[in-house]
A protein has these predicted regions:
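Short aromatic-glycine motifs in intrinsically disordered, low-complexity regions
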Residues: 42-52, 118
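Beta-strand elements of well-folded, non-transmembrane domains
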Residues: 75-77, 149-151, 164-166, 176-178
């Protein structure tokens, strides 16, 4: 790259854009094989999360590591939110994409404790949300959520991505708290 009239401002803009492009290429979509047995199915997820239909937004978990988790949601045309959002052109609401990502993050945090059935997670904060593409009936959402820092005093900070195929459709940073049930 040769610059004819470089200056501080333009160099900064170029460096920011270059960093953004590099980051986007570093993030790889998780590999999902629908024929493989999941690590957690919908019944196991029900044991850990208090959410029920129509608000249980995670169908299965296909990978769990020390600081990451990969979950799946199959979006169908029978989802109740499509009745009003939008009848002629159904689009999954962004807030529900975030909620689904938070539920996957909750499963990651619960996976870090003994006897996870005795704990609950609560969504505290969300930052840097970006929606990049519409989610429509027939899409399979793949969630990858990773811890940004170790869990301290029951508080976890996470970064999550939602993929449809190889494309990132949503990303966010969020915080959750894990609390022992009474």
């Amino acid at each position: 790259i040769i610059a004819t009239r470089p200056g501080h401002t333009i160099n900064n803009k170029f460096a920011r854009q270059l960093r953004k492009e590099i980051r986007m290429h570093e993030i790889q979509a998780p590999v999902y094989n629908c024929n493989e047995e999941p690590l957690m199915d919908v019944n196991r997820i029900r044991e850990l999360l208090p959410h029920r239909y129509p608000f249980q937004l995670v169908d299965k978990v296909i990978a769990i590591g020390a600081n990451y988790i990969v979950g799946v949601k199959n979006v169908t045309s029978n989802e109740p939110f499509f009745q009003g959002h939008f009848p002629q052109e159904p689009v999954m609401p962004g807030v529900l994409q975030i909620e689904a990502m938070a539920q996957v993050g909750g499963l990651l945090v619960l996976n870090s404790v003994d006897e996870p059935e005795k704990y609950s997670t609560y969504f505290l904060k969300i930052d840097n949300v970006k929606f990049r593409q519409k989610v429509v009936p027939g899409d399979t959402l793949i969630f990858r959520v990773e811890l940004m820092a170790p869990i301290r005093r029951g508080i976890s900070t996470m970064k999550g991505y939602v993929f449809v195929g190889e494309k990132i459709v949503c990303e966010a940073e969020f915080m959750a708290q894990i609390v022992k049930n009474k």
